[in-house]
């Protein structure tokens, strides 16, 4: 492209103007030949000056239009291809699970009820590659108020720090590593509308304590957990309430709500996953539980053994757990005459089998059956003739039903439960649950 000369136009205009003025002046006056010659010489000199300025201006513009010399040739870049870049995990992750259930007793249909059993929101935030915080907030039965049966509770709130690839430290409020259900209690993680009785009446799921915990994970499939935590509070035992008969430990756990911490507990758990599809494990918890409020010290101990095997389409699971409370004779003496005394021992056992009958893409139909045996007051300490309560009758429950999964995160459930002792409790259950 020919370079433009933005400054040349004013110079030409000046020359034209000068000539016009000169000619006009010559026509307006009678000039002598000498005067005319002088004016022509002056105009010639001015014209030469303007030409020199124009040449100088053109040279400047040409130099400006030339590219600057490169110090070194730049390497030719390869064509940019839209490669798929791995997406980094977000630092903060929202989690949730929930259960909406319907229960209809077979002998008293008028007592059927529907309930938002649980709604939980949580988040995990990773501060760096080694440290994160885990929290969950739970609402039970939809509404919590002075006139409603609902409850709002913090289910988890702890910091986890990865000391090395095999060892992690947790501090705060965390779930106890007991049984199969307590740490994995989302509705998509268990069969049936309701959680099994063994891991709710004997193991008080969802059971959490505040403290510190070490978690070791090894290449041979072994995971070890252990630590120091808060304990139960036997001073919360209400001998006039039926809560202790429903779940002895569930009625006296503190959930770290202004928890009395004079007495603490130790716990340990081991789980082995060395063979694909097989889990073998066990746990033990033991700690004083009178919190310096009673003359007699009392220790609560709970242990369990559990296994799960998932060969092909099958899914088998079993848990046995047993709990004991020491020195209950001294604790029960002032409670004699009330309906619910403190049991010396309690235990439970279940076996369960499920089968993936049909699946297509994300859909799956899984019928299952579960048989349970549990006793929340298997024995009492001797209080003397006529004062010692009789052991409770061992309850046996069979649950038959099916889970229909829309995906790994959404499940519809239906089942029937039959009780051997409390036959009035026989019922049909429907439910829907989710987790992410």
Language model features with spans:
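Extracellular/periplasm-exposed beta-strand and loop segments of Gram-negative cell-envelope proteins
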Residues: 184-186, 196-204, 209, 239-242, ...
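Loop-centered beta-sheet repeat module
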Residues: 236, 243-292
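Outer membrane beta-barrel
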Residues: 81-235, 262-280, 350-356, 360-379
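Short Gly/Pro-enriched turn/cap motifs at secondary-structure boundaries
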Residues: 201-205, 258-261, 295-296, 306, ...
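Bacterial N-terminal signal peptides that target proteins for export
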Residues: 2-15
């Amino acid at each position: 492209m020919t370079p433009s000369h933005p400054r040349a136009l004013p110079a030409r205009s000046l020359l034209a103007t000068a000539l016009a003025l000169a000619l006009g002046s010559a026509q307006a006056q009678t000039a002598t030949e000498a005067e005319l010659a002088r004016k022509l010489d002056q105009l010639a000199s001015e014209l030469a000056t303007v030409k020199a300025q124009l040449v100088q201006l053109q040279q400047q513009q040409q130099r400006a239009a030339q590219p600057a010399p490169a110090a070194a040739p730049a390497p030719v870049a390869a064509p940019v291809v839209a490669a798929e870049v791995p997406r980094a995990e977000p630092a903060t992750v929202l989690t949730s699970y929930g259960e909406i259930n319907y229960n209809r007793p077979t002998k008293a249909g008028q007592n059927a009820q529907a309930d938002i059993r649980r709604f939980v929101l949580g988040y995990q935030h990773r501060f760096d590659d080694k440290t994160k915080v885990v929290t969950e907030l739970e609402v039970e039965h939809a509404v919590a108020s002075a006139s409603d049966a609902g409850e709002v509770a913090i289910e988890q709130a702890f910091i986890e720090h990865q000391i090395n690839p095999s060892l992690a430290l947790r501090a705060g409020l965390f779930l106890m590593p007991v049984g199969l259900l307590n740490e994995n209690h989302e509705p998509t993680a268990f069969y049936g509308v309701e959680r099994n009785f063994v891991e709710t009446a004997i193991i008080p799921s969802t059971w959490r304590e505040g403290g510190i915990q070490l978690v070791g994970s090894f290449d041979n499939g072994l995971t070890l957990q252990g630590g120091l935590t808060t304990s139960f509070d036997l001073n919360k035992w209400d001998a006039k309430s039926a809560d202790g008969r429903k779940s002895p430990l569930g009625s006296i756990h503190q959930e770290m709500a202004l928890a009395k911490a004079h007495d603490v507990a130790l716990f340990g758990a081991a789980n082995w996953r060395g063979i694909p599809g097989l889990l073998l494990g066990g746990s033990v918890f033991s700690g004083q539980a009178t919190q310096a409020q009673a003359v007699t010290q009392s220790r609560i101990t709970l242990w369990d053994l559990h296994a799960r095997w998932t060969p092909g389409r099958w899914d088998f699971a079993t848990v046995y757990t047993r709990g004991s409370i020491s020195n209950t004779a001294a604790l029960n003496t002032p409670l004699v005459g009330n309906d619910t005394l403190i049991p010396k021992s309690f235990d439970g056992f279940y076996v369960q089998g499920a089968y993936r009958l049909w699946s297509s893409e994300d859909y799956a139909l899984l019928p299952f059956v579960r048989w349970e045996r549990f006793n929340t007051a298997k024995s009492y300490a001797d209080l003397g003739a006529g004062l010692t309560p009789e052991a409770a009758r061992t309850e046996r429950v069979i649950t038959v039903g099916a889970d229909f999964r829309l995906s790994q995160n959404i499940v519809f459930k239906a089942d029937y439960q039959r009780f051997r002792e409390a036959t009035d409790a026989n019922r049909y259950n429907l439910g829907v649950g989710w987790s992410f």
